[in-house]
Swiss-Prot record:
InterPro entries per the UniProt record, alphabetical: Mopterin_synth/thiamin_S_b (IPR016155), RnfH (IPR005346), RnfH_sf (IPR037021)
Official protein name in the record: Protein RnfH
Family: Belongs to the UPF0125 (RnfH) family.
NCBIfam families assigned: PRK01777.1 (NF002490)
Family annotation (Pfam families): Ub-RnfH
Gene behind the chain: rnfH
Record HAMAP family: UPF0125_RnfH
Length: 101
């Protein structure tokens, strides 16, 4: 038997579920056994991106003792768009402080 953690977070809360599973258990089986899909019905496991210790991983991946399985939420904004918005905000702040450049 191995000990793992299933992790998921929303903007409101973060959940970590400790779980003990067989050494032959796959990621998808562990997630289903954890009960997290009942706690968060918005998780669509067939479309969700999952990882182990912040590294993207396939659902059929094997597990090791101490693994932290993370279920990632979809992005709310395109990363390029987010960078552009941050850059514009930074430029406006510099202009307000008189650091225009």
């Amino acid at each position: 038997m191995i000990s793992i953690i299933i992790a998921y977070s929303t903007p409101e809360k973060q959940v970590e579920i400790p779980l003990t599973v067989e050494e032959s258990c796959t990621l998808v089986v562990a997630v289903k056994r954890s009960g997290i899909l009942q706690q968060f019905p918005e998780i669509n496991l067939s479309q969700a991106i999952v990882g182990i210790h912040n590294k993207r991983t396939a659902l059929d991946a094997g597990l090791r003792d101490g693994d932290r399985i993370e279920i990632y939420r979809p992005l709310t904004m395109d990363p390029k768009q987010a960078r552009l918005l941050r850059a514009k905000r930074g430029k406006i702040r510099r202009m307000v402080r008189g650091e225009a450049g």
